[in-house]
């Protein structure tokens, strides 16, 4: 793995800094309800146990909310929870994020008090209201707790009680959290609030403007010209929707359905990123961009209106038409990434992808023809039902896609299928 020490805020060898979007949304919702809190970005700062304790002592928390996006966060969550409980025995410890698919493990193996399951904005606010009236974590009022949708905890019989999934905010009411609170936390707990600017990658680096691995196909005169225009600019990220229209059996989803952000909120965020953080390119971090065609078109119009180039980091081949791609290209789209997963229709059907190898080939062929950058590197091997025959079908298909795009046909970077807790797989 490439060392990223130059990008490490702590001076240690860690990945590029990332946006703690989920927990910022939850805190923003709590603040609208009259509560206050701090963002301590342990993930990016990568602090030692001693540093974590020193920073906790600055706040002396009554409640600590921890976000675990996926199951790989468990070892660090366990470590941090131990520090909190040993030093703040009266503090409530609440865990949320996709790792809530392993609520039983968190509750049995750590000192977690409550797990928020599913969307957290409403459930966490209701939990705060409960704790305000019942501050003692050791004397829970179970008749009241069970009224809150989206919680998992030990009940009066020491059995795990789950109250369903958290109530969702309507799509048009979803807002983008301010980075100001995050910046304050970086200043208070790290080595300076200006660290926030490191999250925005440099557009001077050609690969950053796509969010894809660089390939021969990307070095076109048009894209090189656009890259020269973006020198000195930053690359940011934005979501235009939450959720997906499909139910692939390998995918961990803690939110039901598919919701899109209101256009007024989206435009305000684009303007903020451009004017405050010098962003010239946005990577659209949707699981499933474009399934709501009207919203996808409006997003593209807003990007062009404000002079922003953009790339879609996740889309379904079945959801995007040729006309859609042409429209997006005309409105500043640079690249799009499709979930391909397999070159075997047998495996795609087992995954319940609801798409075909022909759908993907047609999309990549259109991208090549009209000049939208894309990638063929989104394959998964080792799925239940995988055989020598299906693996060879995937290898052949990948070679066909790479040849189609003008890349080296004999290289590939597949991932292993992973059975993440909370998924059918």
What feature does the model see in each segment?
Residues 5-8, 102-105, 156, 246, ...:
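Flexible glycine/acidic-rich beta-alpha junction loops that bind and position SAM and/or redox cofactors
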Residues 85-90, 303-308, 370-371, 403-407:
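Short helix-capping segments at alpha-helix termini
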Residues 164-166, 174-175, 296, 324-325, ...:
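Short aromatic-enriched loop/helix-cap "lid" or pocket-rim segments at secondary-structure transitions
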Residues 104-110, 324, 385-400:
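Catalytic cores of alpha/beta
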